[in-house]
Amino acid sequence: MQEPSEDQATSDELSFVHDAVLLQEAVAAVLGVKALPKQTDDESQNSLQASGIYVDATFGRGGHSRLLLSQLADDATLIVFDKDPTAISVARELANSDSRVKVVHDSFATLTDSLAAMRITQVDGLMADLGISSPQIDDGSRGFSFMRDGAVDMRMDTSRGQSVAEWLETVDDETLANVLYEFGEERHSRRIARAIKQMDSYDSTLALAEVIKVAHPNWQRGKHPATQSFQAMRIFINNELGDVDNFLEQSIPILKVGGQLAVISFHSLEDRRIKQFLQRHSKGQYPEDENLPMPPKRPRYFSKPKRVGPSKAEISHNPRSRSAWLRMATRTDADYVADIHP
């Protein structure tokens, strides 16, 4: 399963105003309720007025954060993370108008250290919406799109790190092919890698997409042949899967007893990681370690793991939600034991 691709979108979608995916479901999950209150004329009945400290680890354009804020009490705190400078600008505007909001311009992989800098050791809920956002796709200058021309950048945080174009200038064919295969599940990775490395320059996403298109021997109907390669390069350059792994592991000590974890993913590489993480930490399994003759049993850190997908109505309204999955779980009272992880 891959991320929703641009070629699967209609022309209306490509001029899309971002809608947060699984909005009601994710916010209800992070608050530990089955559903949010129905909105009525009686405003006092429209909010849960939940107290505590919550984290939106991927602010984006703030859809999930704004709904979550509407359900929080005046003494609650919402800490929002994002790598993207544009997203951070939006987050700071929100923080200026709502004192409950604290902004961190960094990856959610820095969760523990960033919270420690605020003298926060534990929180009541963690929420993340993984992958690329629609505004990032729709902005050709960011380099994520193979339907709009722009620089071959693909960095989530344009203020730091190496762009895809810079990486392509120096990477060898074999390493590139391995990246396309591992992070894009591209079966024709070697053929595509050779074609990419024969390019004179890497200054146009449309030119890069065309080279991949020509090199790709099998076109899948309804899917641009560059979809998986673009996904792979973006995931690699941003260390997305490594950040997800770090975030998930940090969620164990960071969540209070009864705290909620809610994570939305859009492709199988991410969803598989979340699924395996929750399975591993909700069953009290023995860790696989051949060096330990009688390894200690891993504590059961999470209970009630569930998976929820978008409704037919949401998919109809927002086709880009079709591949989304929300996984959620509740932190148990098991003490965190660091020396038997992962």
UniProtKB/Swiss-Prot annotation:
Main localisation: cytoplasm
Family annotation (InterPro entries): RsmH, SAM-dep_MeTrfase_MraW_recog, SAM-dependent_MTases_sf
Subcellular location: Cytoplasm
Lineage, uppermost ranks: Bacteria, Pseudomonadati, Pseudomonadota, Gammaproteobacteria, Moraxellales
Catalytic activity: cytidine(1402) in 16S rRNA + S-adenosyl-L-methionine = N(4)-methylcytidine(1402) in 16S rRNA + S-adenosyl-L-homocysteine + H(+)
Taxonomic superkingdom: Bacteria
Pfam (any one): Methyltransf_5
One cellular component term from this protein's GO annotations in UniProt: cytoplasm
Binding site for S-adenosyl-L-methionine: 62-64, 82, 108, 129, 136
The protein's name: Ribosomal RNA small subunit methyltransferase H
Organism from which the protein derives: Psychrobacter cryohalolentis (strain ATCC BAA-1226 / DSM 17306 / VKM B-2378 / K5)
One biological process term in Gene Ontology: rRNA base methylation
Biased composition (Basic residues): 297-309
Enzyme category, top tier: transferase
Enzyme Commission code(s) on record: 2.1.1.199
